[in-house]
C-alpha cells in the first residue's frame, strides 16, 4: 500500500487531494476552487513579508508602504498582494456563480462553510484596505465603520469600541492590522473544513445527477487541469502586476490620509461595489445597512428557496434566463456603486437593488414551481 495511504499525517491529505472521487464530466469551471487556494496561499506569503516592513502608526503607515519600493523585490510583494486581492474576489465570484448555476448550494454544509469563508474574506479585505492609510483608506474606514451606529441603542458605543476612541485613529489602525494578520489563518482553517465537507458530500456534477456517475480520482485527471488553470492565471496576473499595477487602485489612496480634507467621491474597492450600491439605494440609514448585510446573508438561505425538482439550471430554461439576468444585474450594481450619487444613477441603483432581492426571494421559488408544473405535468398524469 502506498505511504500516502498508510501514514496518519498523509492519509487525510490523500483523501482530500489525491484519491478524492470526482465526477468524470466536470469542466474548467471547477478550477476556481484550486485557484482560490492559490490566491489564499499567495496572499498569506506576500502579506507576511509585507508586514515585516509595515509600521502600524498613523504618522508612519503611509511612508512605510511606500518604503517597500526600496526593499529588494518589494514592489513585487506589494503589487502581487494588492492585485492578488482582486484576483481572489474575481475567482470567488466565479466560484459562487458556478454553484448557483449548477446547484452546488444544495450540498448544505459545504455551501454554508463557503459563505462563512466569503464573509470573512470580505472582512479581511476591508481591514487590509485601511492599512495603507491613504485618503480613501481613512475615509472608507470612517464611513464603513460608522454604519455600525445604525444599531439601535448601542450603535454609538459599538463604533467607539471599534475605533478605540472618538474617531478613526492610531488605535483603529493597530487593531485593524492585528486582525488583518490573523484572519487569513482562520480562513485557511475554514478552507480545510470546507474540503472535509466536500469529501463527505462529494463534488457536484454539471448535470446535477444525485446518483453517482462514473467517478475518477482527483489526481492526475484534475490536478493536470488545475495546473493548467494556475499557470494561465499567474500569467494574466503577472501582466497586470508588471505592466499596469495600479489599474484597480484609487488615485485618492496615493495621497496621505488627512482628516480635514474629504475626497470628492468615497467608494470602496470594486469587489465591494455591489453591496455599496445597495447601501446607497435605500434613503434610510438603518434600512440601507440592513439591506447591505442581507444582500450577502441571503446566500445562507438560498437552499431553502430552491423549489425545483432539478438540481441545476442546464435543464431549466426559465431558470437560466433568470440567472443570466441576475449576472447582468450584479454587473450593473457594481457599475452604479462606482458612480456619484445623482440622477439618473440614484433611480437606476434603486431598481437594480430591488431586482437583486426580487431574484432571490420571489423569482427563484416561483420559477421552480412553474418549471415543475411544465416539465413534470405529463409525468404526474402518467402516475395517475
Curated annotation (Swiss-Prot):
The keyword Metal-binding applies. Heme b b566 binds at residues 95, 194. Keywords: Electron transport, Heme, Iron, Membrane, Metal-binding, Mitochondrion, Mitochondrion inner membrane, Respiratory chain, Transmembrane, Transmembrane helix, Transport, Ubiquinone. It is a multi-pass membrane protein. It comes from the Eukaryota. Its cofactor is heme b. A ubiquinone binds at residue 199. The chain crosses the membrane at residues 32-52, 75-96, 111-131, 176-196, 224-244, 286-306, 318-338, 345-366. GO terms for cellular component: mitochondrial inner membrane; respiratory chain complex III. Heme b b562 binds at residues 81, 180. It is found in: Mitochondrion inner membrane. Belongs to the cytochrome b family. The main subunits of complex b-c1 are: cytochrome b, cytochrome c1 and the Rieske protein. Heme 1 (or BL or b562) is low-potential and absorbs at about 562 nm, and heme 2 (or BH or b566) is high-potential and absorbs at about 566 nm. This is Cytochrome b.
Amino acid at each position: 500500500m502506498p505511504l500516502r495511504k498508510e501514514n496518519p499525517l498523509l492519509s487525510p491529505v490523500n483523501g482530500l487531494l489525491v484519491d478524492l472521487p470526482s465526477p468524470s464530466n466536470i469542466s474548467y469551471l471547477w478550477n476556481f476552487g484550486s485557484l482560490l487556494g492559490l490566491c489564499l496561499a499567495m496572499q498569506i506569503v506576500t502579506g507576511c513579508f509585507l508586514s515585516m516592513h509595515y509600521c502600524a502608526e498613523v504618522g508612519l503607515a503611509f511612508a512605510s508602504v511606500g518604503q517597500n519600493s526600496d526593499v529588494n523585490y518589494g514592489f513585487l510583494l506589494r503589487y502581487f498582494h494588492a492585485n492578488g486581492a482582486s484576483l481572489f474576489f474575481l475567482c470567488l465570484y466565479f466560484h459562487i456563480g458556478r454553484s448557483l448555476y449548477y446547484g452546488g448550494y444544495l450540498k448544505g454544509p459545504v455551501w454554508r462553510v463557503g459563505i462563512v469563508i466569503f464573509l470573512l474574506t470580505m472582512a479581511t479585505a476591508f481591514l487590509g484596505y485601511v492599512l495603507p492609510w491613504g485618503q480613501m483608506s481613512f475615509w472608507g474606514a470612517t464611513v464603513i465603520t460608522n454604519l455600525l451606529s445604525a444599531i439601535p441603542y448601542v450603535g454609538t458605543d459599538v463604533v467607539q469600541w471599534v475605533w478605540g476612541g472618538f474617531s478613526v485613529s492610531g488605535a483603529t489602525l493597530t487593531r485593524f492590522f492585528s486582525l488583518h494578520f490573523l484572519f487569513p489563518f482562520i480562513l485557511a482553517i475554514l478552507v480545510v473544513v470546507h474540503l472535509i465537507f466536500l469529501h463527505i458530500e462529494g463534488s457536484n456534477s454539471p448535470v446535477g445527477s444525485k446518483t453517482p456517475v462514473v467517478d475518477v480520482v482527483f489526481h492526475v485527471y484534475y490536478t493536470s487541469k488545475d495546473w493548467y488553470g494556475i499557470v494561465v492565471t499567474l500569467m494574466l496576473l503577472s501582466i497586470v502586476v508588471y505592466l499596469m499595477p495600479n489599474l484597480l487602485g484609487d488615485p485618492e489612496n496615493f495621497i496621505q490620509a488627512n482628516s480635514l480634507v474629504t475626497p470628492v467621491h468615497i467608494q470602496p474597492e470594486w469587489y465591494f461595489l455591489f453591496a455599496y450600491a445597495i447601501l446607497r439605494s435605500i434613503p434610510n440609514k438603518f434600512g440601507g445597512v440592513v439591506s447591505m448585510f442581507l444582500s450577502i446573508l441571503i446566500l445562507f438561505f438560498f437552499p431553502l428557496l430552491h423549489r425545483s425538482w432539478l438540481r441545476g439550471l442546464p435543464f431549466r430554461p426559465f431558470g437560466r434566463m433568470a440567472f443570466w439576468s441576475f449576472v447582468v444585474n450584479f454587473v450593473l450594481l457594481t457599475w452604479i456603486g462606482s458612480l456619484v450619487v445623482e440622477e439618473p444613477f440614484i433611480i437606476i441603483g434603486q431598481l437594480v437593488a430591488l431586482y437583486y432581492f426580487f431574484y432571490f426571494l420571489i423569482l427563484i421559488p416561483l420559477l421552480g414551481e412553474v418549471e415543475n408544473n411544465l416539465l413534470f405535468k405529463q409525468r404526474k398524469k402518467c402516475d395517475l
